[in-house]
From Swiss-Prot:
Species for this entry: Neorickettsia risticii (Ehrlichia risticii)
Protein name as it appears in the record: Chaperonin GroEL
Binding-site list for ATP: T29, L30, G31, P32, K50, D86, G87, T88, T89, T90, G416, D497
Subunit comment: Forms a cylinder of 14 subunits composed of two heptameric rings stacked back-to-back. Interacts with the co-chaperonin GroES.
Gene: groEL
Catalytic reaction(s) noted: ATP + H2O + a folded polypeptide = ADP + phosphate + an unfolded polypeptide
Main localisation: cytoplasm
PROSITE patterns per record: CHAPERONINS_CPN60
Amino acid sequence: MANEVISGEQLQKVIRDAADLVVSSAGVTLGPEGRPVIMSKSYGGPEVTKDGYKVINNLKPEDEKIAKIVELLNQATSQANEKAGDGTTTATILVGNMIKNAHKHIAAQRSRTKLKSGMKRARDEVVKYIQSVAKKINSEEEIAQVGSISANGNSEIGNKIAEAMNKVGKEGVITVEEGKGLDEFSVSVVQGMVFDRGYVSPYFITNPEKMIVEFDNPYVLLANKKLSSIQPMVPLLETIVRSNRAVVIIAEDVEGEALTSLVLSKMRGSLKACAVKAPGFGDRRSEMLEDIRILTGAKTLVSDDLGVTVESLTVEDLGTAKSIIISKDSTTIVDGGGEKTSIDARVKQIKTQIDKTTSDYDKEKLQERLAKLAGGVAVLKVGGATEVEVKERKDRVEDALHATRAAVEEGIVPGGGATLLSAIAVLEKLSSDDDDEQAGINIVKSALKAPISQIVENAGEDASVITYNLLESKDPNRIFDARELKYVDAFKAGIIDPAKVVRVALESAVSVASVLVTTEALIVDLPTKDNGSPSMMPGGGMGGMGGF
């Protein structure tokens, strides 16, 4: 396939156009007076959203060159969403402004390496500042307040999040599910576990928006060995297909033909499945698989030591769970099908091992297993009058939960873009003997005004006047309330942001902007002419797999 190489001023224009497109599309959603965006969908009616992350992920520019840069810019939002669960629109506005500021320096033939160096020095200083002004939160009341603010002032959501954290601990596992009742909004603690292994392949993803696999009422197949061949699994998988249920395979590894066949079957829609590597190594992996077996109620697991093969299994031997959520880094089992008496006995056994061991390392690992098995999972159930309302409320609760977790982790700072604005004073004191590196520092310094300027403009006010007044006040807690259109104390007014969200937004923006600043060329494929030849896509079932 032929391709085209773009460089120089032509590339710089493509980068600017892509940045302008992303900022103009998502920027209007920022802040309390942010405006909604209507997005067309490939199925169903259009979707109305104020979620900047959704907007950016739905951008599909016709120009292939701009599309490639938009894809790269999306990494800033994805990083922010993945690490902090929020701050995606702020990251977008920051990176767009940095690119705009960098262009004039690139045109002036400044050293791109030095620009990048200056940007990173500025980033490090601002991160230190954010951490220094962050206020830690500890009480259930403070957690409820942060949750309420994160949910646009909804105190009920804040109180439920605080209740859930109180039940399973600040580090505990909390999930959000769709409830059945019209006004249902409840918190319950069920048997469950989370471990730090994710899907083996991203092709298993069922929710592309969140980049996760979600299954309700799946089977759980456990194997303390590598699974490489699909043939021994076919009879069992065919039975699972007929039951119209999903299966999560947790094994030492799933590779080769087995992995390929599972992925292809999932992509064809014939089998709902996901493969996950088992947590731990050696004997610890065996023990953790046994924990999962007891939690899910599986009768046995595939193991050479036990003489149990995949061929010998039936669905009655498999474990179950009410739901399983799998990301690229973790797996959460909610309400496993195991008997409470069996789980309690296993917990008691682990406690005995903790008391008997003389190794600090072994004790630590046993305590980790105990926490995973005994801690349980808090489930927030959210109901509504319609499917659309339930989904919207569920998304809102999930966003508030992410933000609250981030706040508990690193504290809170003045919101509304004020913390980044006040960090300008820190960069005023940062200088470099190298003019090009100083230009890089100035790129970040100028961008720090962008988020609050966008928030103010969305409220219909003059951003230059507001930012000037805030900078002149030299009070980091003084912010502009874009809803009430007045200056207030951030903490008294409850307009705060999780420090982690602000930090990650800045770090993600500098990361992506510095890549684009130093990029010299872009290679894109040229469109091929359709010669009318028939499609070569394979059809039908796969030999030896029973057509599942």
